[in-house]
Curated annotation (Swiss-Prot):
Key words, A-Z: ATP-binding, Cytoplasm, Kinase, Nucleotide-binding, Transferase
Disulfide bridge partners, by residue number: none
Keyword flag ATP-binding: yes
Gene Ontology molecular function: adenylate kinase activity; ATP binding
Residues the entry annotates as binding ATP: G10, V11, P12, G13, V14, G15, G16, T17, T18
Record-level GO cellular component terms: cytoplasm
Localization of this protein: Cytoplasm
Name of the featured protein: Adenylate kinase
Gene3D superfamilies (UniProt xref): P-loop containing nucleotide triphosphate hydrolases
Assembly and oligomerization: Monomer.
Phylogenetic placement of the source organism: Archaea, Methanobacteriati, Methanobacteriota, Methanomada group, Methanococci
Organism: Methanococcus maripaludis (strain C6 / ATCC BAA-1332)
Family: Belongs to the archaeal adenylate kinase family.
Main location: cytoplasm
SUPFAM superfamilies, per the entry: P-loop containing nucleoside triphosphate hydrolases (SSF52540)
Length: 192
């Protein structure tokens, strides 16, 4: 029997991983145990095993065909996990590459995952820019507020297309500065 598959997306620095992890912790205390899977980590495991990337941020620079092959392999691994328990897939709706936006969940991954819900975590572009500038643990390309907002627009468009292709609902969750608990509660209400 298929368990619920929820995809949580957002641009780098929006706080999607933080919001999702906090929600998972609260739901676990209530007895609802999702397996949280980071799609980028699953892809990195494949890329690293093949000697293609030594850190996650290098994967964005791989050629599109290599990225697509890695996505497909990671999607298969995650789909197998959903047979055992509900899964929350932490990923990006789109990945900004030097050659344009790459869908984070192309048709071959969507077919495997068949998500029930696609969640897009967002906030204002200037808040994301400030978060990125203060995060010294990642090697991110410098972007403007306008380019971050364009990326968020592309994420919404991609999320809706994922919903059209799978029948999944699409939910926007706002993660404003200082209001992470509100974002967590909104996410929990969708995951229950």
């Amino acid at each position: 029997m298929k368990n619920k598959v929820v995809v949580v997306t957002g641009v780098p620095g929006v706080g999607g991983t933080t919001v999702t992890q906090k929600a998972m912790d609260i739901l676990s205390e209530e007895g609802l145990n999702y397996k949280m899977v980071n799609f980028g980590s699953a892809m990195f495991d494949v890329a690293n095993e093949e000697g293609l990337a030594s850190d996650r941020d290098q994967m964005r620079k791989l050629d599109p065909e290599t990225q697509k092959r890695i996505q497909k392999m990671a999607g298969r691994k995650i789909a197998e996990m959903a047979k055992e328990s509900p899964v929350a897939v932490d990923t990006h709706s789109t990945v900004k590459t030097p050659k344009g936006y790459l869908p984070g969940l192309p048709a071959w991954v969507l077919t495997e995952l068949n998500p029930d819900i696609v969640i897009v975590v967002e906030t204002d572009g200037d808040e994301i820019l400030m978060r990125r500038l203060s995060d010294e643990s990642r090697k991110r390309d410098l972007e403007t507020t306008a380019s971050i907002e364009e990326h968020q627009f592309m994420n919404r468009a991609a999320a809706m297309s994922y919903g059209v292709l799978t029948g999944a609902t699409v939910k926007i969750v706002k993660n404003k500065n200082g209001l992470v608990d509100k974002a967590v509660e909104e996410l929990i209400s969708v995951l229950r």
